[in-house]
Amino acid sequence: MGGFSFARCLILIVAASTLAVCTANKKWQSGSYQYPKYTQAPNKIIVGGSEGWHFNFSYTDWALKNGPFYLNDTLVFKYDPPTENTTIPHSVYLLPNLRSFVTCSLTGAEMLADVTQGGGQGFEFVLKKWKPHYFACGQHDGIHCSLGQMKFFVMPMLRGY
């Protein structure tokens, strides 16, 4: 019974991360934090805002600052298709669980969009289920995810509650 199991370590990491985010957010501490405007109709949200879906950007921070997200909201992933020597290819995967998210394992993950689907209007994903959704870039065997760059998760909330 001594020692920590993976689940206990994970709970400890999540709790410490939550505490760190809450204490670091000055607006939260001062009570001046304002939630995004609630609407009855589903929202269309561009992942990363004007930055889009690319390397060297914290999507976890973006999700924390732009949430909450609601059931039937649409996440739009915009990224440039790869070109010779100029654009690094990206894709979008839905990871099956928290363990896959933490370890950036693509085993059992579902490819939602390949390297060509983020151009133009982008690839759209509707949050249809009330469960955590774990997203990551799967290019180069998930190296973008492993570097902590292109991954985030959302837990959609129910509207009107």
Give short role names for the model-derived ranges:
Residues 58-64:
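Short alpha-helix capping/helix-loop boundary micro-motifs
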Residues 91-94:
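Beta-strand signatures of extracellular beta-sandwich domains
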